[in-house]
């Protein structure tokens, strides 16, 4: 069965939802591998190490622009299938880029509010340069064997519970 046959037999809404969800999953996989590559590439690693030494981030908007720009290479070819498929795929990629940029910044500025994961916080805090590459989730770290759990000490857990809001982060 080729893609055009599948496209012609499924209802339009199902195709849009499928492409959107597939793009979210694909975006998370790309995020994982790009971050892992940053830790294993000498040239890119030098630039990325500045991020680790300063333990600060560019802000949600700048991170999003960087992620969206890098993801664009994976967006435009899908438009050859159809406009509908291309749009749903691109929106999925951009939604994940926004979620990832927000999660990344939140784990730097206010990790207690990142209730779905603290993997990136742990990656930085405990210098796990060969572990925990996910920014917004740990799924691919678990799949590829790079997940390394770390139990926060009770005092550290208390310190993380600071009274900051979900939007109390660097945006620019």
Where are the language model's segments positioned?
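Core segments of transmembrane alpha-helices
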Residues: 62-81, 134, 138
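Short, amphipathic, aromatic/basic-enriched membrane-interface segments that mark the entry/exit
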Residues: 53-65
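Short, strongly hydrophobic alpha-helical membrane anchors
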Residues: 1-14
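Alpha-helical transmembrane segments
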Residues: 11, 15-26, 88-93
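Hydrophobic alpha-helical transmembrane segments and immediately flanking/interface helices
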Residues: 78-106, 153-172
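Membrane-proximal soluble regions of multi-pass membrane proteins
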Residues: 107-172
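Cytosolic, membrane-interface loops and tails of multi-pass inner-membrane proteins
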Residues: 38-56, 114-123
């Amino acid at each position: 069965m080729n893609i055009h046959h599948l496209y012609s037999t499924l209802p339009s809404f199902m195709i849009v939802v499928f492409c959107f969800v597939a793009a979210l999953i694909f975006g998370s996989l790309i995020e994982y591998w790009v971050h892992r590559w940053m830790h294993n590439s000498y040239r890119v690693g030098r630039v990325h190490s500045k991020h680790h030494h300063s333990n600060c981030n560019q802000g949600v908007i700048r991170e999003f622009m960087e992620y969206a720009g890098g993801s664009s290479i994976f967006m435009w070819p899908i438009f050859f299938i159809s406009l509908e498929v291309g749009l749903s795929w691109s929106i999925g990629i951009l939604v994940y880029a926004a979620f990832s940029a927000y999660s990344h910044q939140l784990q730097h500025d206010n990790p207690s509010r990142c209730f779905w994961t603290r993997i990136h916080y742990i990656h930085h805090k405990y210098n796990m340069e060969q572990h925990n590459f996910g920014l917004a989730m740990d799924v691919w770290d678990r799949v590829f064997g790079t997940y390394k759990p770390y139990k926060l000490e009770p005092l550290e857990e208390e310190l993380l519970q600071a009274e900051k809001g979900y939007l109390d982060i660097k945006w620019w």
